[in-house]
C-alpha cells in the first residue's frame, strides 16, 4: 500500500510547481482568476481578506471574503488550480485565530483587522 502512496505523492509533487507567496488568515490578498467568456479569456481580480486556509498538499484551498456593494462575498479557491493566475499579498493582518468565520457576523469598522507591524 505504501508503494502506491509514494507514486501518488510523487505525481502530486510534480503538479504543485506553482509559486504562491506565503500568506495567512487575516492577510489581504489579490487573487488573479482566469475567466472564460465565450471564446475570450481574461483576468479578474478578487481582493479580500483570507478567512481560512486548508493545507492538504495538492488539495489545499483558501477562502477569501470581501464586501461588494454592501454585500459580503466569499470565494473559496483551490491553491494549485489552473484557473488561478497569481496571488499577491497587499497587507498582513494581525489575528490570533486560524479561521476568521466571526467576520461574517461583523460589519463596518468592527470587521477591520489590525495590521501586522513587522
From Swiss-Prot:
<dbReference type="InterPro" id="IPR018257">
    <property type="entry name" value="Ribosomal_bL19_CS"/>
</dbReference>
<protein>
    <recommendedName>
        <fullName>Large ribosomal subunit protein bL19</fullName>
    </recommendedName>
</protein>
<comment type="function">
    <text>This protein is located at the 30S-50S ribosomal subunit interface and may play a role in the structure and function of the aminoacyl-tRNA binding site.</text>
</comment>
<dbReference type="GO" id="GO:0003735">
    <property type="term" value="F:structural constituent of ribosome"/>
</dbReference>
<dbReference type="GO" id="GO:0006412">
    <property type="term" value="P:translation"/>
</dbReference>
<dbReference type="InterPro" id="IPR038657">
    <property type="entry name" value="Ribosomal_bL19_sf"/>
</dbReference>
<dbReference type="Pfam" id="PF01245">
    <property type="entry name" value="Ribosomal_L19"/>
</dbReference>
<keyword id="KW-0689">Ribosomal protein</keyword>
<comment type="similarity">
    <text>Belongs to the bacterial ribosomal protein bL19 family.</text>
</comment>
<dbReference type="InterPro" id="IPR008991">
    <property type="entry name" value="Translation_prot_SH3-like_sf"/>
</dbReference>
<dbReference type="InterPro" id="IPR001857">
    <property type="entry name" value="Ribosomal_bL19"/>
</dbReference>
<dbReference type="GO" id="GO:0022625">
    <property type="term" value="C:cytosolic large ribosomal subunit"/>
</dbReference>
<keyword id="KW-0687">Ribonucleoprotein</keyword>
